[in-house]
Amino acid sequence: MTTIFERIIEGAVECDKVFEDENFIVIKDKFPQAPVHLLIIPKKHIEKLQDIQGDDFLLLAEAGKIIQLMARNFGIENGYRVVVNNGLEGGQSVFHLHIHLLGGGLLGSIA
């Protein structure tokens, strides 16, 4: 099944893209939960975090570098939240792995 993120990656759906490289696309969330709310999306289809295997773990390291870059570019490097919703019970609504980067204000505690 094709997800909205795959359609965005293919260019079939418009988005507010802020970064793209060989392995990732970063877009502004359509329904932001913070002043800065970005989605870091691997181009390779991986349904959820629990499904990562083998060399795909390297994508997590690359995502970490992109998160740092985006935090600097958006002026939130002094405080931000990184979230991955994993599976239906974890609140995942689009079943293509993606990482939320939220910041730009005082974020309330969630734990």
From Swiss-Prot:
Domain HIT residue range list: 4-111
Single GO MF annotation: hydrolase activity
Gene Ontology CC annotation, any one: cytoplasm
Signal peptide feature range: none
Disulfide bonds, paired cysteine numbers: none
Motif (Histidine triad motif): 96-100
Protein name per its UniProtKB record: Uncharacterized HIT-like protein CT_385
Protein's organism: Chlamydia trachomatis serovar D (strain ATCC VR-885 / DSM 19411 / UW-3/Cx)
